[in-house]
């Protein structure tokens, strides 16, 4: 109905500019979403009401026409009542429409004006119908002399009383009713105006004046109601929102059973950071509006004040509840944290107690191990107990602070004291913060009954009250834990004493054991005890140092704790030195003792103990040294952190305590200087932050050394890193805050200076005004002169009104700037102290400087108004004096006439004439006074309206005024145009110069993005003007807007340059003079500087090109301005003057001209400032250019170095040696630890038994078989290590290949795919060369970057030095060279692009051919192998049967006969080929069996190795015992064993070294890739892609040739074997007898070998059983493969990798990009579980915790085998494969087609209706089904889309187009993955269809959406369009046929499908068309079968389709061309062979 809705509305009445749901603009604010929903509902309701009014009008017209005909035929009028009812209903609906349109205007609907026009048209039509109704039904027959009379005075007085007595509010419901009533009254009053214009009579003027006053009063009341409604609506919304928020807080359970405290905390923090300030600004705005309305005397002061007080009270209560919420949340979190830690400590104590009872219990029989081992384990238990003791002490201290939360929900048996957390005032109940009450009843969890200090009882909200600490349960729990701890400590000390005694008893037999066998050696025993003592001391020192390294620092006093540890570490180091001296002395004694070759147990143990002591001493010394370095670095870092925190806190405190700007002329400048001083001090403290980062790097280096050597992680490092990052962020935040405040104050200072100048000029002008007072002696001429002068003065005063407006505008701008300054300060203060924004009282929003400025502006405005009024009064006095003089002259003339007549008339007649003259003069004076009063009242009312006018107000003017061209205004406009042209030229020059300087400075720091100017769209009310002047003003306005935008860009650029220069000035110099002098002498030319100079030259050329473009733009603007001037001069104003009736000056043009003047002045000032800044920059840069760069050129070159490849190799070799030494050391330590228990066991054994066993073994066995087996096992293990080394080499090759691939694919934001699986690849020499070239490029890039950094640093230092010298200004003239793009280079680029596309196409074609040929080769090989195996098997079986028959015949025949006949014939005459083949087969079988036996033997050896390893790990003591005894027996075998172990250790060390090399290589690859991303070129990428394509093509061709050669070679081999077999047939027949005997022997050998195999298999089964028994105690083996997707962002300045969060915090990306990258990050982990049932692989998303089974995905066909193999081969990324396995797809963001197209009923079965059509009837509707959705590939057993099938030549393009048109005609293009349907445009965007077929698909889509009738503007279905002739039947028939076949026809006005018979009955289609659709024999066969190539109809195609079991979609079978040809050639082959 509405025109506004039909012009570009976006569906269902949503406003054009309103953001859609879920858009970034609409989502952050709930109020915007609510307003959008309310507006949509409002528009839909207005649409329905307007449609109903339209129907009522049409029906009324019809009824009136019928009754009018009845009246003409003298018949009765039949429709009077029905017509009256329709008109009444229409009037009621119009009333609602007028109310709704006001709401739409307040909600800022963009088309509200057009909607209101439509409603007015409806109202006029209803009014016309009402007049026709009255004319027809209410005819009154009046006498001829009596006409219609209306008492207009009484009617207008009644309306005036209604307007005057109208109420305001007090609520929203009453106010809405009042607005509706006044709108009706306003329309009635406006309707009176049409009749009063034609009113004639004596009282016509009085009635018109009365009507005019009534109209003004009604307009005033309407504006008052509108402003009141807007204000009360905002207050109501805020009150409801505050009530909801208060209710959520009050209804929360704050006891220990509170659900999800973490979620409540997150929600509260989010509200505090993002919504609190916005809500406070909204409430402050409402309060300001209320204050302004009360100040201006709004008639509804009462409701406004009531709502204002309610809003203030609710806001204060809400802030108090926020305090309560934060306090209650803190109590709940403390309580839960205490309970969790107490439970953890309790579990720890229980576990320790259980260990003491089970492991160390005396007499229980469960304790295992020697007492020494148990003592060592007990020491670990003591450490855990010490940690638990500290935790219990902490819990006891915190138990006194935990609040008793359970008492909040439990009814109290005795009165409890509760404290009030905040102030609360609900009217009935008042609470004071900190006051204590007595709890009487807490049965209601949300409202408690408390008793105050005075004895009064009140019901208070429970959220505002808290029960004070401590919690009795928490105290009891802490005490109980302390008791358990003491008990456990006593038990542990008891067990420790018992174990020590047992250890002493256990050692005594071992000390006496050697006495029986050998004499004791006292020197050996002494040395052994001394070395044992040293080992114990070293172990104690090691444990002490490790305890320092593992325990974190104290949080409260970290410095003291760290200093104490360093002091203790120094003491430990001194003690270690003394132990080292003792160790050296003891070592010399031991070596001297061992050189005498002593005997005895001490001599045997002494070498081992000595080696152990030496190794431990080295380890402890290294550990102590590393920890000392780490502790010193950490101490320096802690001191630096405290120093930086102190410095930053000082700046933050200064910024937080900064007060408002004081009153005074120089206050702003003082504030600017203060901020600059603080910024300089901040830059001076930059060294503190840099030192902080240096200390952090030193600490990280020390911690990494400790971790790499001893695997000890530093517990304090993460905390220190977080503190450093936080301090850095705070430092940058302080700097940003200072810059922002300085910029705001500087802008405010400039505005304040302009304000002072304007105010002073206006004040001085007001003081110097002339006074034209009337003097008694003035005559008529003097009065006339003063009157003319006074009029000129009045005109000048009116002209000065613009200056007064400028002062007001500047005052407003300055106040806004100062308010922004305060807002920024408050925001920063709240960020420092989060509770300040809630707890602090609301401060005054107007500071002292604002008050003074506002007072001065008010005084100035008052003085101006008084002067204007006084001068107006003076003008009236002069006019009155002139009239009085004229009257006096008239009286004198009259008197002269009377005296001259001499009695010609009577005196009475003279008096009568005189009285008539006086009466006429009196009437004239009265009229003038009334007119002046009326004008004054109009001005007063207008002034009041302007003051109370809302920002968005509608201006209605009924009077149309024609304007003429003012010559003065035209001259002013021409002058303004010329000045604009001059300013444009000056700006162009300044811009070119500024850009040149900016480019030269910017290239030192890098390119920055320029800020694009924002487009400012301003909606203005259109006024009819002269077209020529209007176009000129529009053009000038656009030019000024463009210049202002450019000025903003230049100002921003200038500010950036100033900041950079200031930062460069503050940096300190760090010049190394010696290095400079030496390197200046040596270096003559620097290649990097040459490159930098070339780059600078290129940038200068680019700047010249930009300058040329700017000049061309200026020339265009000048030509445009000249054209405008010519157009202005060509206009003839004389013609326009003739048409003008009312000559006035256009106030809009006057204001526009004055505004242009002010803008020009501002632009001049800005240009002056820019020129001054430009001169400064030029001076600075000129000084930099003059200074020769040789002094500082090589300042940091000495620091730039590159490690030589030989050095890197040496470092790697040393690192490998170091790791090998470490591995040897660890192996020796493990051996020593294994041998020590054995020594004690040997000591405890009886010497006789040991001696006899040794003697027997030495005598009887020279070589022990077990030792030999052990040697064989170790050799096998050595072979296994060699194989592992080979696999590592293969892994290295694979990683190198992946590195090269990553170098080609990685970009700015990279996705790292980390896989731990090993895939074997071969080295590619081409890729190796490419990698070397890339490394060289990376090194060159690093050198260029470092050289650039050096140049930047040098120029900064030069600039700093030259700035201090302050040289004189000079003008620099530079020659700029204009460059253009080379067309040859552009053609070469396009040619390379085309050639790359051709190469890609050829490569894909070759890949397709190779795949087809590969498949054919595999099929042929499979067929040949199958036939060969089958023929061999048949031949062997036939030979076996023949041999069996022959043997049976020989056995059955008599011996003589056999001897005479058979044997001779066989030997002499026959050669049996079958027997020969059988023999060969048996030989091959024998070889296979031998190989199998060998493999089984090898497997048996491997299993034996595993069994030995398991036995070794399970029972180490027994194994080591045997080895120790045999070591003593056979030193040869011991040497062999030592050698094998040495080889094993070397192999392990080598493997670790290779793994370290692989890791280092991977890291270098990552670093190289990170640097390469920023230096890659597009041409290099194209060239590499082309080379890769050619390489792949060559490789594929080579593979194809190799396959063909292999095939030919196999064929030749088969032929050669056949020929050789035929040649050997004759000779083999002669040896048949021998072969038969050999066969018998072979059969016997085979049986023997089978027996051996069976024996081996039995042994293997036993070993398997043993292995399975050993693995029973272990869990199922699980292999995990980490596959993570991590987003890295390259930092623009340093080139380092950053996470998305770091990039977002540093401002590199915005919040939207951060959220998008955060969603892309995932951490997939492939977990493969091996169990007896097999292996099972699942994908685990470590980020969300979800698991997805790969086997289940294969079974459910979410993935295919091809995709699985691609993933295993690394060709499918993990992210895509994980999404396929999980079955997740991206959700559809919108519906398929527009707002009027609903989804298919399959997807959304509920009925839907649109906002533009009535629902209609829904009878006879059926559900639809999907059309043919895709193609089923029979070759790969997969589905694909129609677009992909056409691209693969599986489907005819015409058939594909028909299938897509069928989808579009039945609801949209189908997406096979998501089963969603999309419109044609959406499908093009998603890539489902091609762009070439869009138009045909759009035509087909009309069958679903319908078309619009050009005449009636109604939506028609295609059947109706055919009947009306709007569409041809031939083009629509296929679409209707598809709809009929898929469920029925589609009517766009209804949901669901309609059968053809029902459509014929409804008139949707004709009967002929219905018969044509139902006749299946006449269906056109326009489709082609992809397999059989026969023509078929759409129904036949649907019959041949296969239905997808998952989605239910129809898929048309098809196959590839190559497979189709092969199947046609060999149709009898099975499917497996074909595939």
UniProtKB/Swiss-Prot annotation:
Superkingdom per UniProt: Eukaryota
Biased composition annotated in UniProt, kind: Basic and acidic residues: 1607-1631
Compositionally biased tracts (Low complexity): 1-27
Record keyword Transport present: no
Region annotated Disordered, chain positions: 1-37, 63-84, 400-419, 1607-1637
Domain SH3: from-to ranges: 413-470
UniProt keyword Phosphoprotein, yes or no: yes
Region ranges (Globular 2): 1675-2035
Plectin repeat feature ranges: 1186-1227, 1679-1714, 1819-1856, 1857-1894, 1895-1932, 1933-1970, 1971-2008
Main location: other
InterPro entries listed in its UniProt record: Desmoplakin_SH3, Plakin, Plakin_repeat_sf, Plectin_repeat, SH3_domain, Spectrin/alpha-actinin, Spectrin_PEPL/EVPL
Biased composition (Polar residues): 71-84
Description of how the protein assembles with itself and partners: May form a homodimer or a heterodimer with PPL.
Record protein name field: Envoplakin
Organism for this UniProt entry: Mus musculus (Mouse)
């Amino acid at each position: 109905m509405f025109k506004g809705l039909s012009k570009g509305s976006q569906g269902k009445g949503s406003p054009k500019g309103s953001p859609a749901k879920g858009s970034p603009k609409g989502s952050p604010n709930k109020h915007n979403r609510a307003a959008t929903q309310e507006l949509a509902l409002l528009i839909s309701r207005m649409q329905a009401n307007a449609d109903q009014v339209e129907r009522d009008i049409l029906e009324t017209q019809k009824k009136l026409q019928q009754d009018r005909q009845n009246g003409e035929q003298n018949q009765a009028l039949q429709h009077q009542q029905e017509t009256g009812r329709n008109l009444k209903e229409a009037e009621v609906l119009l009333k609602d429409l007028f109310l709704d349109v006001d709401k739409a205007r307040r909600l800022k609907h963009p088309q509200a004006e057009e909607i209101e026009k439509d409603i007015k048209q409806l109202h006029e039509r209803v009014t016309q119908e009402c007049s026709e109704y009255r004319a027809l039904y209410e005819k009154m027959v009046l006498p001829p002399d009596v006409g219609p009379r209306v008492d207009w005075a009484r009617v207008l007085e009644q309306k005036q009383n209604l307007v005057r007595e109208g109420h305001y509010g007090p609520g929203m419901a009453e106010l809405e009713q009042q607005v509706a009533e006044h709108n009706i009254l306003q329309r009635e009053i406006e309707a009176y105006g049409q009749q009063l214009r034609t009113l004639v009579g004596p009282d016509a003027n009085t009635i018109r004046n009365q009507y005019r006053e009534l109209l003004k009063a009604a307009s005033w009341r309407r504006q008052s109601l509108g402003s009141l409604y807007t204000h009360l609506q905002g207050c109501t919304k805020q009150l409801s929102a505050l009530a909801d928020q208060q209710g959520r807080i009050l209804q929360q359970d704050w006891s220990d059973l509170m659900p999800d405290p973490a979620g409540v905390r997150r929600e509260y923090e989010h509200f505090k950071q993002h919504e609190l300030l916005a809500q406070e600004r909204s409430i402050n705005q409402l309060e300001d509006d209320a204050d302004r309305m009360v100040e201006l005397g709004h008639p509804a002061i009462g409701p406004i004040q009531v709502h204002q007080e309610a809003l203030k009270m609710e806001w204060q209560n809400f802030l108090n509840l926020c305090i309560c919420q934060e306090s209650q949340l803190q109590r709940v979190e403390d309580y839960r944290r205490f309970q969790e830690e107490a439970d953890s400590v309790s579990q720890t104590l229980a576990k320790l107690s259980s260990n003491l009872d089970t492991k160390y219990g005396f007499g229980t029989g469960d304790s295992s191990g020697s007492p020494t081992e148990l003592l060592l384990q007990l020491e670990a238990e003591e450490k855990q107990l010490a940690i638990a003791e500290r935790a219990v002490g902490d819990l006891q201290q915190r138990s006194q602070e935990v609040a008793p939360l359970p008492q909040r929900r439990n009814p109290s048996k005795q009165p409890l004291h509760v404290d009030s957390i905040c102030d609360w005032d609900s009217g009935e109940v008042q609470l004071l913060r900190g006051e204590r009450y007595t709890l009487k009843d807490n049965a209601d969890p949300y409202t408690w009954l408390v008793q105050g200090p005075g004895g009064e009882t009140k019901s208070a909200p429970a959220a505002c009250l808290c029960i004070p600490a401590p919690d009795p349960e928490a105290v009891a729990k802490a005490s109980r834990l302390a008791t358990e701890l003491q008990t456990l400590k006593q038990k542990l000390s008891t067990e420790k004493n018992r174990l020590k005694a047992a250890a002493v008893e256990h050692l005594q037999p071992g000390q006496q054991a050697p006495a029986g066998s050998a004499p004791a050696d006292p020197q050996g025993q002494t040395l052994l005890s001394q070395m044992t003592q040293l080992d114990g001391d070293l172990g104690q020192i090691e444990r002490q140092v490790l305890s320092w390294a593992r325990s974190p620092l104290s949080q409260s006093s970290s410095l003291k704790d760290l200093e104490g540890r360093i002091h203790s570490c120094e003491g430990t180091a001194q003690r270690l030195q003394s132990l080292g001296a003792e160790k050296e002395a003891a070592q010399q004694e031991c070596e001297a003792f061992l050189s005498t070759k002593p005997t005895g147990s001490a001599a045997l143990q002494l070498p081992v103990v000595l080696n152990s002591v030496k190794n431990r001493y080295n380890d402890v010394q290294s550990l102590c040294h590393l920890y000392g370095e780490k502790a010193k670095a950490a101490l320096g870092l802690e001191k630096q952190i405290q120093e930086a925190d102190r410095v930053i806190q000082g700046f933050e405190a200064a910024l937080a305590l900064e007060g408002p700007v004081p009153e005074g002329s120089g206050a702003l400048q003082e504030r600017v200087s203060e901020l600059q001083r603080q910024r300089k001090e901040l830059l001076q403290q930059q060294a503190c932050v840099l030192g902080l980062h240096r200390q952090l790097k030193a600490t990280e280096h020390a911690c990494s050394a400790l971790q790499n050597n001893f695997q000890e992680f530093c517990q304090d490092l993460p905390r220190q890193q977080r503190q450093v990052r936080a301090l850095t962020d705070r430092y940058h935040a302080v700097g940003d805050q200072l810059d922002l405040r300085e910029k705001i104050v500087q802008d405010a200072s400039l505005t304040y200076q302009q304000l002072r100048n304007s105010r002073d000029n206006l004040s001085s002008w007001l003081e110097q005004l002339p006074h034209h007072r009337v003097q008694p002696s003035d005559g008529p001429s003097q009065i006339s002169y003063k009157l003319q002068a006074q009029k000129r003065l009045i005109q000048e005063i009116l002209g000065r009104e613009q200056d007064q407006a400028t002062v007001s505008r500047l005052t407003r701008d300055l106040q806004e700037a100062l308010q922004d300054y305060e807002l920024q300060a408050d925001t920063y203060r709240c960020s420092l102290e989060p509770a300040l924004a809630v707890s602090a009282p609301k401060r005054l929003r107007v500071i002292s400087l604002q008050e003074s400025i506002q007072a001065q502006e008010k005084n100035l405005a008052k003085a101006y108004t008084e002067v204007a009024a006084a001068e107006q009064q003076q003008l009236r006095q002069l006019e009155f004096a002139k009239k009085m003089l004229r009257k006096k002259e008239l009286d004198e003339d009259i008197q002269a006439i009377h005296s001259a007549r001499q009695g010609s008339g009577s005196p009475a007649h003279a008096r009568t004439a005189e009285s008539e003259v006086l009466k006429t003069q009196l009437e004239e004076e009265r009229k003038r006074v009334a007119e002046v009063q009326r004008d004054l009242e109009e001005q007063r009312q207008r002034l009041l309206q302007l003051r109370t006018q809302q920002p968005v107000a509608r201006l209605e003017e009924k009077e149309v005024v024609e304007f003429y061209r003012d010559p003065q205004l035209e001259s002013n406009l021409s002058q303004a145009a010329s000045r604009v042209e001059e300013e444009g030229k000056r700006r162009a020059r300044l811009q070119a110069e500024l850009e040149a300087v900016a480019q030269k400075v910017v290239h030192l720091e890098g390119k920055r993005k320029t800020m694009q100017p924002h487009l400012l769209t301003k909606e203005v009310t259109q006024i009819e003007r002269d077209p020529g002047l209007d176009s000129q003003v529009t053009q000038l306005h656009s030019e000024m807007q463009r210049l202002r935008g450019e000025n903003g860009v230049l100002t921003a650029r200038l500010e950036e340059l100033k900041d950079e220069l200031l930062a460069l000035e503050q940096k300190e110099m760090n010049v190394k003079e010696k290095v400079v002098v030496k390197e200046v002498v040596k270096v003559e030319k620097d290649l990097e500087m040459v490159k930098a100079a070339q780059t600078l030259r290129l940038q200068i050329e680019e700047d010249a090109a930009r300058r040329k473009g700017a000049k061309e733009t200026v020339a265009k603007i000048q030509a445009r301005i000249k054209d405008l001037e010519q157009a202005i001069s060509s206009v003839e104003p004389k013609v326009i003057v003739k048409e003008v009736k009312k000559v006035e000056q256009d106030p809009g043009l006057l204001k526009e001209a004055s505004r242009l003047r002010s803008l020009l002045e501002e632009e001049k000032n800005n240009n002056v400032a820019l020129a001054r800044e430009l001169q400064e920059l030029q001076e600075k840069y000129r000084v930099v250019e003059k200074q020769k760069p040789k002094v500082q050129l090589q300042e940091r070159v000495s620091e730039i170095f590159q490690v030589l490849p030989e050095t890197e190799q040496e470092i790697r070799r040393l690192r490998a040696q170091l790791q090998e030494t470490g591995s040897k050391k660890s192996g020796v330590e493990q051996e020593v630890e294994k041998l020590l228990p054995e020594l004690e066991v040997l000591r405890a054994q009886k010497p006789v038994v040991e001696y006899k066993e040794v003697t027997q073994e030495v005598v009887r066995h020279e070589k022990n078989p077990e030792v030999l087996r052990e040697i064989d096992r170790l050799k096998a293990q050595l072979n296994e290590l060699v194989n592992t080394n080979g696999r590592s080499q293969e892994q290295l090759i694979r990683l190198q290949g992946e590195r090269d691939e990553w170098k080609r694919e990685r970009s700015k934001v990279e996705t790292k795919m980390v896989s731990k699986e090993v895939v074997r690849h071969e080295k590619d020499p081409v890729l190796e060369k490419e990698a070397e070239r890339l490394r060289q490029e990376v090194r060159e890039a690093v050198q260029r970057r470092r050289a650039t950094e050096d140049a930047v640093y040098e120029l900064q230092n030069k600039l700093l030095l030259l700035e201090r010298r302050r040289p004189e200004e000079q003008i620099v003239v530079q020659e700029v060279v204009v460059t253009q793009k080379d067309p040859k280079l552009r053609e070469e680029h396009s040619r390379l692009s085309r050639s790359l596309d051709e190469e890609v196409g050829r490569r894909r074609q070759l890949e397709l051919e190779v795949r087809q040929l590969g498949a054919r080769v595999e099929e042929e090989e499979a067929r040949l192998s199958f036939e060969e195996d089958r023929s061999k098997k048949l031949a062997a079986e036939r030979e076996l049967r023949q041999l069996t028959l022959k043997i049976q015949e020989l056995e059955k025949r008599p011996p003589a006969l056999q001897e005479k006949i058979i044997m001779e014939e066989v030997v002499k005459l026959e050669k049996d080929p079958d027997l020969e083949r059988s023999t060969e087969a048996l030989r091959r079988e024998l070889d296979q069996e031998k190989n199998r036996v060998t493999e089984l033997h090898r497997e048996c050896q491997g299993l034996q190795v595993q069994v030995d390893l398991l036995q070794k790990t399970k029972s180490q003591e027994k194994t080591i015992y045997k080895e120790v005894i045999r070591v003593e027996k056979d030193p040869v075998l011991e040497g062999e064993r030592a050698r094998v172990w040495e080889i094993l250790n070397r192999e392990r060390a080598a493997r670790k070294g290779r793994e370290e090399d692989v890791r280092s290589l991977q890291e270098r690859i990552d670093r190289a890739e990170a640097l390469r991303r920023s230096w890659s070129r597009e041409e290099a990428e194209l060239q590499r892609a082309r080379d890769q394509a050619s390489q792949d093509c060559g490789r594929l061709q080579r593979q194809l040739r190799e396959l063909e050669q292999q095939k030919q070679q196999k064929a030749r081999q088969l032929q050669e074997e056949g020929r050789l077999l035929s040649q050997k047939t004759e000779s083999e027949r002669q040896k048949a007898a021998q072969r038969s005997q050999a066969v018998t022997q072979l059969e016997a050998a085979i049986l023997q070998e089978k027996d051996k195999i069976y024996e081996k298999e039995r042994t293997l089964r036993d070993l398997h059983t043993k292995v399975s028994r050993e693995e029973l105690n272990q869990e199922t083996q699980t292999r995990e493969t980490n596959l993570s997707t991590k987003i890295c962002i390259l930092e623009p300045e340093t080139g380092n990798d950053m996470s998305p969060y770091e990039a977002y915090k540093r401002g590199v990306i915005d919040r939207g990009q951060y959220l998008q990258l955060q969603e892309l990050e995932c951490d997939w982990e492939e977990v493969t579980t091996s169990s007896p049932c097999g292996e099972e692989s699942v994908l685990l998303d470590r980020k969300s915790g979800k698991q997805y089974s790969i086997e289940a995905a294969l079974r459910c066909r979410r993935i295919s085998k091809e995709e699985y193999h691609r993933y295993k081969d690394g060709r499918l990324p993990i992210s895509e494969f994980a999404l396929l396995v999980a079955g997740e797809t991206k959700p559809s963001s919108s519906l398929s087609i527009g707002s009027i197209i609903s989804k298919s009923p399959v997807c959304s079965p509920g009925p839907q209706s649109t906002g533009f059509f009535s629902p209609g009837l829904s009878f006879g509707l059926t559900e639809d089904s999907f059309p043919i959705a895709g193609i089923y590939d029979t070759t790969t057993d997969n589905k694909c889309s129609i677009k992909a099938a056409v691209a693969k030549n599986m489907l005819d393009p015409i058939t594909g187009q028909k299938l897509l048109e069928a989808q579009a005609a039945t609801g949209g293009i189908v997406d096979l993955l998501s089963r969603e349907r999309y419109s044609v445009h959406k499908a093009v965007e998603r890539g489902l269809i091609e762009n070439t077929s869009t138009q045909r698909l759009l035509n087909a889509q009309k069958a679903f959406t319908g078309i619009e009738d050009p005449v009636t503007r109604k939506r028609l279905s295609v059947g109706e369009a055919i009947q009306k002739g709007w569409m041809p039947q031939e083009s629509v028939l296929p679409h209707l046929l598809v709809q009929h076949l898929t469920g029925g026809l589609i009517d766009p006005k209804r949901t669901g499908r309609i059968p053809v018979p029902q459509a014929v009955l409804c008139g949707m289609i004709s009967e002929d068309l219905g018969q044509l659709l139902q006749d299946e024999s006449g269906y056109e066969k326009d489709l082609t079968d992809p397999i059989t190539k026969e023509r078929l109809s759409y129904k036949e195609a649907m019959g041949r389709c296969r239905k997808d079991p998952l989605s239910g979609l129809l898929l048309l079978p098809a196959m590839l061309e190559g497979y189709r040809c092969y199947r046609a050639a060999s149709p009898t082959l099975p499917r497996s062979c074909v595939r």
